[in-house]
Amino acid sequence: MARLFGTDGVRGVANTELTGELAFRLGRAGAYVLTKETKHAPRILVAMDTRISGDMLESALVSGICSVGAHAVVAGVIPTPAVAYLVRKYRLDAGVMISASHNPVEYNGIKFFNNQGYKLSDALEDEIENIIMSHPEILPSPTGIGLGTKEYAEDALDDYIAFLTRTTTEKFDGIKVALDCANGAAYKAAPIAMLDLGASLCIIHNEPDGTNINDKCGSTHMDDLKEMVVQNGADIGFAFDGDADRCLAVDEKGNLIDGDKILAICGLDMKERGALAKDTIVGTVMSNLGLTMMGKEKDIHILQTSVGDRYVLERMLADGYNIGGEQSGHVIFLDHNTTGDGTLTAIQLLSVLKRSGKKASELAGIMQTMPQVLVNARVNNAKKNSYMEDDVVRRGIAELEEKFAQDGRVLIRTSGTEPLVRVMIEGTDIKKMDAEARKLAALIEERLQ
């Protein structure tokens, strides 16, 4: 049986895979596991992004939480990183975010945070899953005054915005910023925070209707933002994903500034200010080789973890580093928050822009990007993690690695949230890379149906 939890909580098509019944069971088991050591009636923050399925899942989740005697503190639509922050600020026992991040509207997800604002370890997720699948009878079913209640965190959005504005000493007067809010959870927080810090704004995709989240917008569809930056003469642009835990940027010329370049820009600025812990940036195996080359030039250590912001965070916590992230735009500023935070990332990058007096394109020039090609193979979800067990696929990967051994690298990995095997090639000949990546992806699709 496939594991219920993926790399970022439980995720699936709402109402068929992620049903109200499953949300109820997750609420019960999650509340129990995360609060069973507390000596008081536990309180758990619940928030969501703008998907139409959010109301259904919130109702079921809250019911599950209350049914084991915990209290649900409902915050409504706020970004995922707001949950991480507010759990700590309000001294709550846990937090839950209902979101499928960058996925299309038909998907939704549920991810938990502990009382310190961190995503759960594999061990805790396994404990929750084991109770749901095998031992639901151990869960309490109190009656009368033992039941939990629901309350509303009416100041949640304002408190999160106030936190964001305190993460910089800079004022952004005179800076024109373009925002693409992905019709998602950032649609209020990001514009208000930027305006409070003095920036002038032009905004797109900030009118969510429940169905338009991530729809040809946000950090996975950057064309609208690039066009708006150039047409409006903006100094920089930022795009968020559906739950606003990631951010990508666009310079004044309309060129992409991805997560690797954001790490390079902000990491170097931190080093120059004496604020970069152990002169180290934590990336992943998907980080562009250009980031490593920048690190060597600027005397900054670049470490690599497995793909996934949870693994970046684990390394940061284990060894005392304070900045890390992924090419996709998950950037963790551990001095400020315990998870990737898109609006916080935008504010930190704007702060560097303000301090330096440079244009965004000039800042991005500190890192030269090595060409990468990424092709997704859509496969049977039950087979995606066993691709190396297929002899034909294994030989195909070995042959590809041999072709690029001298002037590039090949990385094959599975998606933690979708039925995909990703083929990434880094090198110098883009035409050759693209052809070879597509060839291998087609082979993987054929073999893993």
Where are each of the predicted segments found?
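An N-terminal, well-structured beta->alpha segment
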Residues: 1-63, 67-68, 149-177, 385
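Gly/Ser/Thr-enriched, mixed-charge loops and adjacent short helices
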Residues: 13, 108-232
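N-terminal small/polar loop signature for handling phosphorylated ligands or for N-terminal nucleophile
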Residues: 32, 36, 40-107, 192-250, ...
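Short beta-strand-to-turn element immediately C-terminal to the catalytic PLP-Schiff-base lysine
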Residues: 112-115, 248-252, 332-334
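Gly/Ser/Thr-rich active-site loops/lids in small-molecule metabolic enzymes
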Residues: 121, 203, 255-274, 342-351, ...
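Proline/glycine-rich low-complexity loops and linkers
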Residues: 126-161, 166, 252-325, 332-333
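Phosphate-binding and adjacent anionic-ligand microenvironments
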Residues: 236, 273-449
